[in-house]
A protein has these predicted regions:
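Donor-nucleotide binding loops and adjacent catalytic segments primarily
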Residues: 1-80, 111-115, 119, 126-136
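Conserved donor-binding loops in enzymes that form glycosidic bonds
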Residues: 7-8, 159, 172
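A ubiquitous structural signal for well-ordered alpha-helices
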Residues: 21, 48, 139, 153-156, ...
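A donor-sugar binding/catalytic signature common to diverse glycosyltransferases
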Residues: 68-110
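Residue-level detector of anion-binding/catalytic polar loops
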Residues: 96, 122-123
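Two-component system phosphotransfer/interaction surface
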Residues: 131-145, 170, 174
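A short, well-ordered alpha-helix in the C-terminal region of glycosyltransferases
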Residues: 149-163
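C-terminal alpha-helical cap of glycosyltransferases
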Residues: 162-180
Length: 180
């Protein structure tokens, strides 16, 4: 399953880029898509896709998803923004991803986040202003179609994980609390 989302409010450019590839995505008979558009974008995306009943069985549109953990756990691949919370969730589950940093994020931190993932081999990255490009399409379909690409990303993501994260975080919290 391909999960597409842009954070809790959605991401219009991601929505538009994925909608533009509707026919090519649906040409893959085993591909199911869960597309979380953002509440304000749901009607526009629904209208733009104009899914038939058969297509709607494979392309599930939601304005918002409050059970994101379960949705992420079901994903084989993800297209999303590169915010810290999204990446923490994606990382914990080692899900292959195509990251699209939000270009107006403070200090461009989402690009910094995504770049670290790309350098480790755990994700692809595409700048927001290049979402309509052939490169976006090539990366998306490599993610969907090539099991070895996904397997490599999973292995890279797992190599980044630490089993000591909770203990390290607790040490920081205790250190800050006792310094007061």
């Amino acid at each position: 399953m391909l999960l597409v989302f842009g954070g809790s409010l959605g991401a219009r450019h991601i929505n538009e880029a994925v909608v533009a590839l509707k026919d090519e995505l649906l040409a893959r008979p085993n591909l199911h898509i869960v597309h979380i558009t953002g509440p304000k974008e749901l009607d526009a995306v629904t209208e733009a896709l104009a899914l038939t009943d058969d297509e709607a069985r494979r392309w599930h549109l939601l304005g918002y998803q409050d059970r994101m953990g379960e949705t992420l756990a079901a994903a084989d691949a993800i297209v999303s923004r590169a915010g810290a919370t999204s990446l923490a969730e994606i990382s914990a589950l080692a899900i292959p991803a195509l990251l699209v940093p939000y270009p107006l994020a403070t200090a461009d931190h989402q690009t910094t986040n995504a770049r670290a993932w790309v350098e480790s081999g755990a994700a692809f990255m595409m700048p927001d202003d290049e979402l309509g490009s052939d490169e976006f399409k090539a990366k998306l379909f490599a993610l969907i179609d090539d099991a070895s690409v996904r397997e490599g990303m999973v292995a890279a993501a797992r190599a980044q994980q630490t089993g000591e994260a909770a203990a390290a975080l607790a040490d920081v919290v205790v250190g800050v609390a006792t310094a007061r």
